[in-house]
Amino acid sequence: MPTTTEFDTIAAISTPPGEGGISIIRISGDQTFNVVTQIFKGKDLSRVQSHTINYGHIVDPDTHQEVDEVMATVMRAPKTYTREDVVEINCHGGLVATNEILQLILSHGARMAEPGEFTKRAFLNGRLDLSQAEAVMDLIRAKTDKSMKVALNQLDGDLSKLIRHLRQDILDVLAQVEVNIDYPEYDAVETMTTKMLKEKATEVAQSINQLLATAKQGKVLREGLATAIIGRPNVGKSSLLNHLLHEDKAIVTDVAGTTRDVIEEYVNVRGVPLKLVDTAGIRDTEDKVEKIGVERSRKAIGAADLVLLVLDNSQPLTAEDRELLQETDQSKRIVILNKTDLPARLDQAELAQLVDLSDVLSMSVLEQSGVTQLEQRIAKMFFNEGIESSQNNVMVTNARHIGLLNQAKQALQDVQTGLAAGMPVDLVQIDMTRCWEFLGQITGDSYEDELLDQLFSQFCLGK
């Protein structure tokens, strides 16, 4: 594993670009103080106490031109995010001053950090394991308080502790197998029986199954619930989107076909992050642009975790309504009867022949009635008994982790199959070792450089 001395000193802007109260430029590496002292006018930062904030100015040493008035936060290794020497320069927000300071840092010994490189160093230097490093990005991207709480639990190491406990259990079994193989002549050595190996495989598999039982909810919390709002034109889809978002994101008019494309937005519905997709009204049309929007709408239905099918309660069912009801029959859906503020003309008896009325919710987006009930129903559909968790309040949210847990589970099934077939214990232990290795990939106890490059490239600059 690389050590801090093998790394260049890196720098990046940690705050979003644009105007703001402050901007932060982060520097990390063994040459941090050599770089900063060349451009910082004030106290000698190489001598100040760690974890202090120091007032001063950034000055171009070549022109002696003052660039900005700043506060510099000094943090010495190893008690930093990267376990390297770190300085964070807080300057006035804005593109010009921030970029000028960054360029001075880069021209005096640092290089530009790659996306996620600060967190990558935290992993390589042993401050975080891989699952904790991934939780950093989950925390940044959290859309709801529930998402944030799950990410914080993972960052605190809850998942890591459980995985390492399982790996240690497996390692203990493998050690006993090795002793039994290497020293079969010693009667005092505890014999690893087929029964004992089977019991341990069953025990670990139960823990993995408990983790996997949280995966569905966890994936929703991490990635959001892809929710398609569909219906024929002018039934109130865009009005529903705007109401859920509490802002006018979609154009609302009486003209059918106004929404020509798919609009995507995230919204927090009682702790459930919904990735709302407002689709173009689905109907037969000769308009080329609208036709493209309709085709995208149909694709959105296929990709959705939840379909909100909006019908107009003030109009009789149309052939397009019936087609959409049939097309979404196998989808997880809620059928919304909108415009209940107007006289009802939709035949409820006919609707009952096409859909289970328990899936139907009446509402008037215009009068803001029924929206609370819609939010309650969505939350109940996916979190009926609240947030599931396994031992120690652990939830699995990451698709990579889910895949590795399934591979570990399969390896344990192979152990059971081998034992049932009467295979020698020394052969069965190969599958037990595979399980141990798959679990190790979750925490990064075993990894490939290509995996690290792929994971950390998804991070933002400065993190």
Swiss-Prot record:
GO terms for biological process: tRNA methylation; tRNA wobble uridine modification. One of its GO terms (cellular component) is cytosol. It is an enzyme of class 3 (hydrolase). (6S)-5-formyl-5,6,7,8-tetrahydrofolate binds at residues 26, 88, 127, 463. It is found in: Cytoplasm. Residues 224-383 form the TrmE-type G domain. Its EC number is 3.6.-.-. HAMAP family: GTPase_MnmE. This is tRNA modification GTPase MnmE. It comes from Lactiplantibacillus plantarum (strain ATCC BAA-793 / NCIMB 8826 / WCFS1).
